[in-house]
Swiss-Prot record:
Subcellular compartments: Cytoplasm
Pathway: Porphyrin-containing compound metabolism; protoporphyrin-IX biosynthesis; 5-aminolevulinate from L-glutamyl-tRNA(Glu): step 2/2
UniProt superkingdom: Bacteria
Example GO biological process: protoporphyrinogen IX biosynthetic process
Organism: Acidobacterium capsulatum (strain ATCC 51196 / DSM 11244 / BCRC 80197 / JCM 7670 / NBRC 15755 / NCIMB 13165 / 161)
Reactions that this protein is recorded to catalyse: (S)-4-amino-5-oxopentanoate = 5-aminolevulinate
Name this polypeptide is given: Glutamate-1-semialdehyde 2,1-aminomutase
The keyword Isomerase belongs to this UniProt entry's keyword annotation: yes
Cofactor dependence: pyridoxal 5'-phosphate
Group of enzyme by EC: isomerase
Pfam families: Aminotran_3
PROSITE patterns found in the cross-reference section: AA_TRANSFER_CLASS_3
Family annotation (InterPro entries): 4pyrrol_synth_GluAld_NH2Trfase, Aminotrans_3, Aminotrans_3_PPA_site, PyrdxlP-dep_Trfase, PyrdxlP-dep_Trfase_major, PyrdxlP-dep_Trfase_small
Keyword terms, alphabetized: Cytoplasm, Isomerase, Porphyrin biosynthesis, Pyridoxal phosphate
Length: 429
């Protein structure tokens, strides 16, 4: 990969680590990351002309595939009028109406430019509403890189084995209570120790940043009951799961209604976009109506609104067949690779919720961060490199979920399973 190598050398001179987001550096899996220049449907192309089958989907947004024509057309049409106004536009209301239809728990919402902004703003709102200062999050759940949410987070922190981030004052970190995922007893104990002090629980209702970890039956409902009893808010971080596992996210699947919801990734159709919302009683605390300040130059950016409208409207009109198709394809590829691992005698545990999944290199169930951490990351790195050599691009970390989109076909599934068979055989030799 001569061209990618040259681009990498230039990037390392100009960007810290040669990247704008740490996991992209491939440090956890080894080798040099290819530099991508084109994508269409379920396929990627690098600067050297190599083609790959994509199972990371830009970390989740590309549920309709890359360069989906209605999305591209919507962006091009809007760009001809302006890429940014910094003022109110009709498209904000258009997309907001779609989101509210999909997520009835969100009576009102506000658009921002990233998932990090959405979660950061939701926490500020929760603290203002409850007049409390502590928050509860869970080991391995990643909610963006704001200071108060980097304690024992997943994603890149898990990839690099870092418990938190330098530069976060101890006084801020102490206000975040980090508990094991899927453990209601630990949550009960935290509320008992901090009676009338906890503002909210924030949770990935299906975790994706320690790999895909599914909540135990009754866990989310238990969090809902606990927060109601204790006067705290429940925040579902559906940045990854929103419009992904179902049109209405995990809250639709599990029939649990949170107080606040954060969205990102798919809601912006691949453009920088996030959103947070909930009941009007809470949301109206935001300026200009209330005392909670939040603002952004590019919030509700018309390009993001156009891409989001094209994406979400297609998902809404197609949801009766689209989500069952994603389920069928995802089950086929997840099970197919797992069967090849079993034939090769390689311990593998598959976790999946709809079209997001992870192959954990362990023979034990993975239901929290501790069990995810016990996986054989060396073997995952071998698998990742082997699959990349076979033209299959997986997330470059054991602790990141993989994604499948509607552009994937059964031919792609067969290609992936065949590649896995050959890679597992090589790993055993």
């Amino acid at each position: 990969m001569i061209r990618s190598h040259m681009l990498r050398e230039r990037a390392e001179r100009l960007l810290p680590g040669g990247v704008d987001s740490p996991v992209r550096a491939f440090r956890a899996v080894g080798g040099e990351p290819p530099f991508l220049v084109k994508a269409e449907g379920a396929c990627l192309w690098d600067a050297d002309g190599n083609q790959y089958l994509d199972y990371f989907g830009s970390w989740g947004p590309m549920i309709l595939g890359h360069a989906f024509p209605p999305v591209i057309e919507a962006i091009q049409k809007q760009a001809a009028f302006s890429t940014s106004f910094g003022a109110s536009t009709p498209s904000e209301g258009d997309l907001a109406e779609l989101v509210v239809r999909a997520y009835p728990s969100m009576e009102k919402l506000r658009f921002v430019s990233s998932g990090t902004e959405a979660t950061m703003s939701a926490l500020r709102l929760a603290r203002a509403y409850t007049k409390r200062k502590y928050i509860v999050k869970f080991d391995g759940c990643y909610h963006g890189h704001s200071d108060g949410l980097l304690a024992k987070a997943g994603s890149g922190l898990a990839t690099f084995g870092i418990p938190g981030s330098a530069g976060v004052p101890e006084e801020i970190a102490q206000l975040t209570l980090t508990l094991p995922f899927n453990n209601l007893d630990a949550v009960e104990a935290a509320f008992a120790a901090h009676r009338n002090e906890i503002a909210c629980i924030i949770v990935e209702p299906v975790a994706g940043n320690m790999g895909c970890v599914v909540p135990d039956e009754g866990y989310l409902q238990g969090l809902r009951e606990l927060t109601r009893r204790e006067g705290a808010l429940l925040i579902f971080d559906e940045v990854m799961t929103g419009f992904r596992v179902a049109f209405g996210g995990v809250q639709e699947l599990r029939q649990v209604r949170p107080d606040l919801t954060t969205l990102g990734k798919i809601v912006g159709g691949g453009m920088p976009c996030g959103a947070f919302g909930g009941p009007a009683e809470i949301m109206d605390l935001l300026a200009p109506l209330g005392p909670v300040y939040q603002a952004g130059t590019l919030s509700g950016n018309p390009l993001a609104m156009a891409a989001g409208m094209a994406t979400v409207s297609h998902l809404e009109s197609s949801k009766e067949w689209l989500y069952p198709q994603l389920e069928q394809m995802s089950a086929a590829v997840a099970q197919g690779v797992a069967e090849e691992a079993a034939r090769a005698g390689i311990p593998l545990t598959t976790n999946r919720q709809g079209s997001m999944f992870t192959w954990f290199f362990t023979g034990q169930p993975v239901r929290d961060y501790a069990t995810a951490e016990s996986c054989d990351t060396r073997r995952f790195a071998q698998f990742h490199r082997g699959m990349l050599d076979h033209g299959v691009w997986l997330p470059p970390s054991q602790f990141e979920a993989a994604f499948l989109g509607v552009a994937h076909t059964m031919h792609h599934v067969e290609q992936t399973v065949t590649a896995a068979r050959e890679v597992f055989a090589a790993m055993q030799s």
